[in-house]
């Protein structure tokens, strides 16, 4: 099956889908709790950009969801990012055991993946951004990228790259100074292709992993 994709902020009531995707895409050591993700979706829905999957309708059938004019890619080779911009590609099992995936029957829209972030005037990444939505400063100069996640069944279609590129363009439009993310060392070269530069080892200690901080500077 092929899909078209539209992009929008999440809705507070989609917290269960957001929490499930987090558990699927990260190992138990690095996944944030379902409660944390539901709370963030409820308090900061605009700080998520979600890719919504719409099954394409075969020719001759009623249009329905498949008619959404949006990005369409059937087999893109763009690699899914890793680290806290992750897809559970670290060889560890995901932490979604016992959780139920949201489907079109459970919610009107099916979220294929998302990028989540927080605005701040702080210059460097810290783990408190993951857990404390009150640290969000709507007019903050910098964008802290907290996660980039795509469900396994929707990977290899360029969604991760599209979500990241849309976020970069939006930050430019809003006049932000820079975007900051953390990743593992084997993903540094990939993020450099998106304009990010290595800053050094991050202060993040999430999951006992060595993270590297990178930034994409938009303004000097």
Q: Residue spans of the language-model regions?
A:
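Conserved active-site alpha-helix within GNAT-family acetyltransferase domains
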Residues: 173, 185-209
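A short beta-loop-alpha structural element at the N-terminal edge
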Residues: 4-17
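Conserved GNAT acetyl-CoA-binding A-motif
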Residues: 164, 171-184
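Conserved acyl-donor/pantetheine-binding loop and adjacent beta-alpha core of acyl/acetyltransferases
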Residues: 57-149, 155, 205-210
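Acidic/histidine-enriched, beta-strand-rich ligand/metal-binding domains
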Residues: 146, 153-155, 174, 180, ...
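Cytosolic beta-strand hydrophobic patch enriched in CBS
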Residues: 48-53
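Conserved acetyl-CoA-binding loop-helix of GNAT-fold acetyltransferases
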Residues: 150, 156-169
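Helix-loop element at the rim of GNAT/NAT acetyltransferase active sites that forms part
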Residues: 9, 19-34, 40
């Amino acid at each position: 099956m092929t899909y078209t994709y539209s992009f929008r902020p999440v809705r507070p009531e989609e917290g269960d889908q957001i929490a499930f995707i987090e558990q699927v895409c990260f190992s138990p050591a690095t996944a944030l709790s379902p409660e944390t993700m539901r709370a963030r979706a409820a308090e900061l829905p605009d700080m998520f950009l979600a890719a919504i999957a719409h099954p394409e309708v075969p020719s001759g059938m009623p249009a329905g969801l498949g008619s959404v004019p949006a990005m369409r890619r059937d087999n893109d080779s763009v690699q899914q990012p890793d680290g806290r911009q992750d897809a559970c590609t670290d060889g560890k099992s995901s932490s979604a055991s016992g959780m139920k995936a949201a489907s079109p029957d459970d919610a009107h829209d099916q979220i294929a993946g998302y990028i989540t972030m927080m605005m701040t005037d702080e210059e460097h990444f810290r783990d408190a951004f993951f857990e404390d939505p009150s640290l969000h400063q709507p007019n903050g100069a910098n964008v802290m990228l907290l996660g980039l996640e795509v469900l396994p069944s929707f990977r290899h279609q360029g969604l991760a790259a599209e979500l990241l590129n849309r976020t970069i363009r939006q930050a430019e439009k809003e006049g932000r100074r820079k975007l900051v993310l953390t990743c593992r060392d084997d993903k540094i070269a990939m993020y450099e292709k998106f304009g990010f530069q290595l800053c050094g080892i991050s202060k993040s200690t999430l999951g006992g992993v060595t993270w590297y901080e990178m930034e994409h500077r938009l303004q000097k």
